[in-house]
């Protein structure tokens, strides 16, 4: 503003102050005047007064609507409830009166005031007086203030004029736009009618300012004119009045106050508002004129007065009170809400109510009052407090909206805010920021701004914003206050200054809330800008010029300004239009639903265009909110006041306009606005552009955005913008960028952060508004987008806010926007919020408001490099989403220390395939789900200390890969009492376990000692360690591998040891465990007590720079050989994929190894077939030679790009000799062809010998040659490694699996007890003899090897020694050779030959034969059945392992690291490629997990490793993957061997497996082995033999018993016969015997049992026997009856007869 304008403003303020008492009198005059015009209508329906928008263009139109322009004394308007609703806004309507006229009127007012010489009442006095007047006067009495009094009282006149103008504007918002200037003149007319002489005269006196004021007012009015706006204006006017008064008035009569307020406030509002408006208008007479349109905007302040006019006295009082007692704002705000409710009853109030529901939406709609009512029940209350707002409310609904923007009176109060809002809410806001800052500088000239701050008193802003439904109330209040401070500038410069400085900062600080409001007011700012040009002229004189342009366009811009303010308010008041026009501000800017919206777009074309630009910048106003943080530096308070004024939406808009300072900022913002808009995306830029740009962004969010803004404010104005974006689809999109923007506008965030607490509160409102506005945002968004660069920035800002928004605001934003968007936005600015560099993302030491609540997800292409270290220590992360790690696939170290994690799930770390270091200490983790660590196959370190873990349930450390690399685990400082996870004890590589400060029992220690055989250091709780120390000597004597380190505390501790009985007993379980460990492993275990001050954190000093996993070339070759077959299986060019990476792992060792490899190619061939000792010696020699050449070797990293190109001339030349010589030496053996190639290049490499050793070349050509040769050397070395690996693959196929298995046992200490078992050696002859059994065994092992080695990989051989290349040890024969070969061929030699052929063919074609694959697959099934549950068993174990892995997959949703990492987006070409690979490898790799891992690695190498920055990482991935496959294969073979030869041991080792399927398969496998393996079921057979023998024995015994029984019976019969001839048996007996012998049945020749057996069967014998008995009996008779002398003869005859 020019210095002339500033004095004018000062005069106006002083006069307003003087008119302090006048409001009491003037309101009566005004009331009488109104009564004359429409005594009944006015009383009954203030809207009717307002409804007569005869000249919507005229800022006084609303007034004239009440009092026809032609007859100033006839304020009667068509009895239109709608108009009446805008009667409150009618003040705003009047405000919108043409800037000239309103300026003139303002000038008269100022003059009158000055002439009166009266000084404004003190805030308390004024409030009291207004209150008394209100109480004494009825609404009718209040309303009819005579024009004379108005003349006398500039405040009253202003209010009347505003009321009249507003009425018109309300009646025809569009007309308002068209006739902004006309309104201005019309305003003069109605004023002349109402207060013709003085008012006009006074307008004439300061024509320049008046005109400016008029236009700016008019602009505000047009927006204010919107029905909704009008109601809002009414409520706002009430609020404005009520700031001080409303607390009382509203409390006394909240609803009636609304109606009365227009009448009562006229005086006070005219005083208060008029002063601000006049001041605004008058101060920038020149500028206002220059900003002719701005003056129109300024006129809005007049409109605000008009709003007051609706209840002028009350408003005036309240506004004065507001100004004086901004703290009362909150009270007023609440009453104002009631007021709004009252207006809601009329059509306009309903619209306001809607507004409150959807401020942003409402502004678009004509019914702004409802919007305001809803959005700003509080806002309106706040507006009620600010007379300006009240005036705005008075303006007719349509006009009121237009007026609202136009209604400078409202804007006047928060000129700064208006500035922010007015210019283009966006632009203005941004400008406003600058302007505010300028205003701050111009605090003298911009006392208005300061006074507004004072009016707000800093506190009022907050109350208002809170009532505004957040920030809006504050905004209105701020806006209103700004005007008053302008008015009060003269009366109480100190107060104004204090308020301006503090309030502005306070308002800024207070609010972000105000900030939000400011966005709403930003539209108003344009109007205010005109009014405030004086203030902001300094602040933004340059800006003001833009504002002038804007104002020139302002006529439209008025509407837009209103819209802009409305938009800003829209979030609060008229979301509809606001959203459409300014995204946020536009919506607000369009208080009149249709008109404003149209205007807003139009405004962009007219002043609105500038304003639109401004509006576009308005998003920056949103930024401005962010700026509001800066606003402290800048005159944020003005913005805030403006924002506060927008409280009613329209009022807010008016206030924005009213705020002259704001208007200037609007100009400035406007000027900046284009930039702001452009910069808006870079909210930071906005802030940089001029605080306004940034602020404008903030402003955009006023209602919703304001809230977002607020939260964002803290961060940067961005958030408000975000809200707006949220409303706007586009903003949402930008939201993602916004994080970056936010980071860009780090300053705003800081300011915002400071403000955030308030913004958070506002954010809530704004969130609601945003939601409500969301529909409008589409329209507004459209406009915004058109205007829109601002929109872009808002989005960016929003993301920034979100990212910063670790605050509630962020959460709300997130809720409003899609969570993904929110994340995206957060990630977008992640490098602004956090530190990005050196492959590290560090988000530590953030402010509490900025701390992360979720893992940030960076947008693609936001960071050129990769992050290998993520440090999120000290944030608020409480949950980890499933797919959050997709963007960090190369991360190796993750620190989540000191967050709020409570539980870990199986998908918590999906996607971190390369992770090695995981720090989860000092969280609140209570539970860990099964398979949680399964996605981390290469994890080495886990820190779970300082949590609340009470138990480790089964499967916590379960994973299909067995966690082969985990060697450090920290569990200390947990209330851990139970460890039920056997997988923990079985971790194969665990070397360090810290369980200090836990409650683990002695049983856990026993399990550790028994099963964790590789453990080297164990930290125990002090009580347990001290207990063991009491028996230190005994323990160390029993198990020499266990060492106890006891500290002094333990040695002196005499505490009773609960475990003493168990530990001290030599025959107890503990000692037996120690003995078993002694026999089981030779690894030395050190047991230590916990350290009292132990932080439990292990620092891996060399973690970031650790070398590749394989430090020996031979080891690298052996690991590489485990993955080469898979590359070949899928027809990939191995050289092109691996050559760029192969050199990397070995460059540290020395490229000179190439020579050794080449020279010893043949030797390697022999060594592979020879004993292991030879092999070891060979590789030791190779190592020594390579070490000698290390000094001369140059790193090949620099030549990585060249080496990648296999087609380079040097590589081709190198390859040709190889191709030629290979056939010669190997006679077509493809496997050795490549080795020969290496030899071919030996010469070339040897040429480099001197150079590599360090011998300098004397000639420059010689120097060049070494460089070229170095490249050749690197490439040759890589190729030689590939060939070596392939040769290893081929040679290992012929190796004997038996030896390999044996070696495996030797390698694994834990399996040492199995080392001595070599049954296969004995079994081999049998296998050869029995082809069937041999085929079965070989087939089983082959499938296993194929599955475990992942197809034809020499995994078994390589794994046997973890670095040895001996093919003998590698059972690759089984792996690569088709099963059919083993089955068909009984001869091992024949099989071997065929295998070799197969292998050669495989190497040649890089593909396994179909038959082989199918065979392997077929035979894998039996193995699967045999699998015993461990993941790494040979042969039968393979199946089991596969089964188990599959089961685990089910547990993890079948998503191993690769799957979860790669499959989220199936549409991705990489994902499609990986799926295809998985399908191709299915036949080769039955296990799903292993197959996915290999597919993912291949996909990564092919598609994600092209960048130079990931070369080393990719090389590490290749090495680790090969090493993992090697370990898995070795373990599988060991398991399989155990299953084959030790069933009991096999069962023990597999007790961990819970799977029912696995158990059933194990049983089936055991049965198969029993049937197929000779001797496997010997015990069973022995038992069967014994059983059979027993049965046979029993049968024999039974038979014998039967025979004996029969014999005894026969003997009995013989005895009976003898007894009968007892007296004469001797001779007969001898005859009988002789007869039996004659029959061939001699008693001596045959066994008695046999003879007796046949006796019963001889019928003849029976008959003979009977005959003999008869004969004997007859002979006896003869003997008895014969004579003694004849006795011998018969005897002899008988004997002779008997003998024959």
From Swiss-Prot:
Residues 1182-1191, 1201-1216, 1675-1685 have a biased composition (Basic and acidic residues). SMART domains: LRR_TYP. Keywords: Glycoprotein, Leucine-rich repeat, Membrane, Repeat, Signal, Transmembrane, Transmembrane helix. Residues 238-249, 358-368, 482-493, 729-749 have a biased composition (Low complexity). It comes from the Eukaryota. Residues 1604-1700 are cytoplasmic. Residues 1-35 form the signal peptide. Residues 36-1582 are extracellular. InterPro entries: Leu-rich_rpt, Leu-rich_rpt_typical-subtyp, LRR_dom_sf, LRRC37, LRRC37_N, LRRC37AB_C. The keyword Signal applies. It holds the Pfam family LRRC37AB_C. LRR repeats lie at residues 137-160, 230-253, 267-290, 864-887, 888-911, 912-935, 937-959, 963-987, 1002-1027, 1124-1146. One of its GO terms (cellular component) is membrane. PANTHER family: LEUCINE-RICH REPEAT-CONTAINING PROTEIN 37A, LEUCINE-RICH REPEAT-CONTAINING PROTEIN 37A-RELATED. Belongs to the LRRC37A family. This is Leucine-rich repeat-containing protein 37A2. It comes from Homo sapiens. The gene is LRRC37A2.
